[in-house]
């Protein structure tokens, strides 16, 4: 369609149409039907006015090109196709000189003979429907409406067609030709169906009474009336010279617009310092599961029963000892806490009946680990407002940390496939309407690509842990409840599987506000030796608790089993979001859908099936120091999902700030790649705002390093 438009219409018309679309942020390459419609409308407006003049007696005459009388006055003033500001200026000056009522919308033409504005319509639908829409929109008796259709029909206000028969026939013939040309190229059907109803762009509401008085009172300084302010706003040209506009707005602003060139941007400065450490609420790639297949034991589905059953599958327990202490903590307490969990689980087994929940004894080690009695006493402000040296705690600035390689490994692992399926097909909601047939097809394809993904395991694990912790926090506020960390999946053969990752012990949880914190101690199984990357485990105390026999290609090998223990905390609002982690599936599905939509609109048919089934095609996944990484559509789905999941797992104010500020720089760089000649002011301030968020958060630091790779490749 785009090629057709460029061949079929005069280059000046094409250029005006492109400019008009850009002004409203639309892309002629994507919205090709709209591009064709705008060109057609422009051409009809120009043909309407061509060859029509007014002679000395004020009569309308037709003068063919090349006629010596061409110095006569044009009968029509063309308003359509002009810059908005210029167009309003023309309209205002016509109204001032002729006394005609000012229209609410920009009309297309002014007729000097009949002294009226004209609104031209070109429709692919019924002329009378379109006529009514136009009339409804402009609500003005004074503006004359004239509608043409591609089938040769026309309709005008009071059946007054303004022009002679021959001039109108020229327009109808041209429209018919355009239609035939489109049809012969197979473009007509899509063009005909794409017409929407009238779009209201620039209506001027009349404000009266009290609202009018309020409007006059609430104007910015230096404006005497609402009219005066409106005229100023209308004259504000969106693509004009920004410096001048800024200085008009305020005397204090002096912005120099600097052109943004390939050589302008510098890489983001990542902080120096010790390597960053793991801060997720549970272990990710380092987690180890004790699992039971096809669970059918008594009380199956009750977490404590499931946990005990999983613990019994392992026989390699040994006397625990500390292999990597926590720098600041009392490490023997972590060791005692684990021993207490083992002992209390043993007590349950020795008992008559297994209870549904287990509250731990409030031992000194657990009180210490859960920060019991550590919170400063709260005092009523009334009792202490007279204290002379009342002040807020001094809090230390966070220590800057450098990017460590482990976070990229975590991300890569999250994109990988596991040998189990973590979601059923219905995790993403059901169809409601027939239109959703395509949607459910897309959803099923997408689910097939991500159901086995490790990021999906993290979602289900996060949902489970947060739900269990929030429940316990509300149901057993004063108790140190033992909460197993469990997930469920299906094997490749479709057998159900229940997995135990470890345990959480919850502290006191009188959570009145969304941000009130509940402390918990997490104890998680792992085969990762913490001494390989001690910086990653700074916040953990790691115990060696057993030996596990693993089947490998060379036979069975024994590997030490570790327990990662740490004190952590969360809040009602964080748990609420954690319970909603399935939204990550939806977010990444929507990103994939927009890719499919873009492809479908280029091909002018739905390409969902080809998109997922054409295994040979590769898609851009992301930037790395090597360049743009590409992969299969499944890999794209899993990468987008992993990004969304990590945004949830590593949510933080640093991430919020970095995402918002770096996006501005990203848009400027993309504008440069699209040859839009972007300009900036205070680019230094933008860099400062971005880099202020690069402190110590592993996920933010990784995103910043990806951003630098993007800058390098984007500007080559």
UniProtKB/Swiss-Prot annotation:
It is found in: Host cytoplasm; Host nucleus. The keyword Ribosomal protein does not apply. Mn(2+) 2 binds at residues 80, 108. Keywords: Cap snatching, Endonuclease, Eukaryotic host gene expression shutoff by virus, Eukaryotic host transcription shutoff by virus, Host cytoplasm, Host gene expression shutoff by virus, Host nucleus, Host-virus interaction, Hydrolase, Inhibition of host RNA polymerase II by virus, Manganese, Metal-binding, Nuclease, Phosphoprotein. Its EC number is 3.1.-.-. It holds the Pfam family Flu_PA. One of its GO terms (molecular function) is RNA binding. Binds 2 manganese ions per subunit. One of its GO terms (cellular component) is host cell cytoplasm. Its main location: host cell. The keyword Zinc-finger does not apply. Plays an essential role in viral RNA transcription and replication by forming the heterotrimeric polymerase complex together with PB1 and PB2 subunits. The complex transcribes viral mRNAs by using a unique mechanism called cap-snatching. It consists in the hijacking and cleavage of host capped pre-mRNAs. These short capped RNAs are then used as primers for viral mRNAs. The PB2 subunit is responsible for the binding of the 5' cap of cellular pre-mRNAs which are subsequently cleaved after 10-13 nucleotides by the PA subunit that carries the endonuclease activity. Influenza RNA polymerase is composed of three subunits: PB1, PB2 and PA. Interacts (via C-terminus) with PB1 (via N-terminus). This is Polymerase acidic protein.
